Amino acid sequence: MSKQSLSYKDAGVDINAGNTLVERIKSDVKRTTRPEVIGGLGGFGALCALPSKYKDPILVSGTDGVGTKLRLAIDLKKHDTIGVDLVAMCVNDLVVQGAEPLFFLDYYATGKLDVDVAADVIKGIADGCVQAGCALVGGETAEMPGMYHTGDYDLAGFCVGVVEKSEIIDGSNVKAGDALLALASSGPHSNGYSLIRKVIEVSGIDPTTTQLAEHSFAEQVLAPTKIYVKPVLQLIKHTDVHAICHLTGGGFWENIPRVLPSSVKAVINEKSWEWHPIFKWLQEQGNIDRYEMYRTFNCGVGMIIALPQEDVETALALLQQVGEKAWVIGKIEHANADEEKVVIC
């Protein structure tokens, strides 16, 4: 009796599906390209030259995911914007140090490859790369039977940028008297989603039918993370930016001290900006205390920028020109070593 001849497909890995996906995404990848990119998809490694305008270039790298926002995206079958979130979480961390993102790579892992879903996700990644001005130069699609539940997938992103060595922003120039400028967020971005999902569970709502501020809750909670690269690079060009804080996991309490010298503190007026409606809903439905809100969520603020008071008017005008909502939310003050680095009052 002859034995059955087994194939990789019999084991759950469909190489043809992977090849189909590559063909599907080529046009999306192409629209992200930069002049520095050498070659196209299909190589073992991606090649990229440094932009010639840099005299003493320093590479800046970052990697991130989208946390359990992905669980909601999968459950609500909304796959076309989660890739924007993935890019945003990486490139926003790079621009904090003054870096221009150059190229991006993604990792997409699943138990059984659904070409349509994967193509939607990668289209979103390409959209994010276009917004950030970086090239999608490659990635890995891993089909791993037995590793994920049916329909589930996971994402990771990797980005490299470049900054002139003399123009690195590291917070060392922050001084008492600097103004704190806040850039509005589009919602929770990609942080706090385990708590969001718990509040949804406790409240018993249906995200697809519940309305919140003239939009469905699902639209609000899955709104893609804002990509601040282009407006922030313009601010850096036209004002004297001393520090930039990307409000991610840990919120205000954890992230702001990362960009401040030990001799100062950030004093923030919580009445100076608008909370996005979803945060008010979360606080009410989850009975979440004030400290926890500021520790878990961005509460309507995606980035905070420290700069001299004399540059505030220029910065606000520039941001208005490019359609970014911004507020002056506080200032930098002297602090003793044992004082809290963030005061919200």
Swiss-Prot record:
Q: Has UniProt tagged this entry with the keyword Nucleotide-binding?
A: yes
Where, subcellularly, is it found? Cytoplasm
- GO molecular function, a single term: ATP binding
A GO CC annotation recorded here is: cytosol
What are the alphabetically sorted keywords of the record? Answer: ATP-binding, Cytoplasm, Ligase, Nucleotide-binding, Purine biosynthesis
Q: Give the EC number(s) listed in the UniProt record.
A: 6.3.3.1
Q: What is this protein called?
A: Phosphoribosylformylglycinamidine cyclo-ligase
Which organism's genome codes for this protein? Histophilus somni (strain 129Pt)
Q: Which gene encodes it?
A: purM
